[in-house]
Regions:
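N-terminal accessory regions of S-adenosyl-L-methionine
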Residues: 1-121
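Conserved class I S-adenosyl-L-methionine
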Residues: 137-146
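Conserved SAM/SAH-binding beta-strand->alpha-helix loop
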Residues: 169-171
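Conserved SAM-binding motif I beta-strand of class I
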Residues: 162-167
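Domain-level detector for long C-terminal conserved domains
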Residues: 179-277
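Conserved SAM-binding loop of SAM-dependent methyltransferases across substrates and taxa
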Residues: 147-159
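Conserved alpha-helix/loop element of class I SAM-dependent methyltransferases that forms part
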Residues: 114-137
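Short loop/helix-cap segments at secondary-structure boundaries that form the rim of catalytic
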Residues: 173-179
Length: 277
């Protein structure tokens, strides 16, 4: 497996204890003799630890426990207890239940990214590098930036690029959060930000707009009406977990396939970057 570059967004939260990692450590011990399962657990650990330490996580592939993984577990048990099928069957009963728990943890790893780090879009060094190269230093406005992970990565890759990073934190429904922005984020709504910086940039970025609001559709209408020359890039799941139905119904989309190829789908969310008109 080729090692990815390291890319930092800052000091990270440096949490001393993470429930998710504690659970994975137990599973890693249980399945240490099953390489395919062990690799997935180790990669999940690596991803969470990286974000906690202030680094963008590695590329993930499909994380669910597959039928091949199940066969590998059964083969390992058979090799361990070739002459004791009764004992082997009991071990399999225990490990089958553990596998279901592993599968749940791995397929819901994005929930961990969100709960402990407020990282919604899955941003890897490869993805950010490809996007940075595509932007090619053009002045860019990020709206609804959340904690600023996207722009922080772009800034780290190209420090001279002019980036306006904005969010009014309407998305933050919990009353208290210990997660702080990883880059300076100006408190502006999406529409306010476009009106303020629309004449100073060439690109507008929007990532993981909520599916409970039509602010994304309002943004698209504003860009079409007043700033038609701006390039509008959107990260999200078409007709899925992000953005409003109205937005997807009205947006003219171009899949940026070269950038998307750097980040395969790893969970139930088919997250992509699109150029939108």
């Amino acid at each position: 497996m080729m090692l990815e570059q390291q890319l930092s967004f800052g000091p990270g939260r440096q949490l001393e204890y993470i429930d998710y990692l504690d659970a994975l450590a137990d599973f890693l011990l249980e399945f240490q003799n099953v390489p395919t399962v062990k690799q997935k657990i180790s990669l999940a650990q690596q991803s969470v630890r990286a974000i906690n330490q202030g680094f963008y996580p590695p590329t993930l592939n499909a994380m669910e426990i597959t039928s091949d993984d199940i066969l590998a577990v059964q083969a390992a048990i058979l090799a361990r207890y070739p002459d004791d099928p009764e004992h082997g069957n009991q071990v399999w009963a225990d490990q089958r239940e553990a596998l279901e728990q592993v599968d749940y943890c791995l397929q819901n790893i994005r929930d961990e990214f969100i709960e402990d780090f407020n990282m919604y879009a899955y941003l890897t060094p490869q993805f950010l590098t490809a996007l940075s190269q595509y932007l090619n230093g053009r002045p860019t406005l990020e709206i609804m930036a959340g904690q600023g992970y996207l722009s922080a990565g772009l800034q780290a890759l190209q420090p001279s690029q002019k980036l306006y990073v904005t969010d009014n934190q309407d998305w933050l429904n919990q009353p208290i959060t210990a997660v702080q922005p990883v880059i300076d984020v100006e408190s502006l709504s999406a529409l306010e930000a476009i009106e303020r910086y629309g004449t100073e940039v060439e690109v507008v970025l929007m990532s993981w707009a909520p599916d409970t609001s039509e602010i994304d559709w309002q943004v698209l209408q504003l860009l079409r009406q007043k700033y038609p020359t701006l390039e509008f890039l959107v990260i999200g799941e078409r007709d899925g977990a992000t953005d409003s139905r109205t937005f997807w119904q009205n947006a003219k989309l171009k899949d940026l396939t070269a950038i998307n190829a750097t980040r395969p789908q790893f969970d139930l969310i088919d997250e992509k970057i699109y150029r939108v008109q």
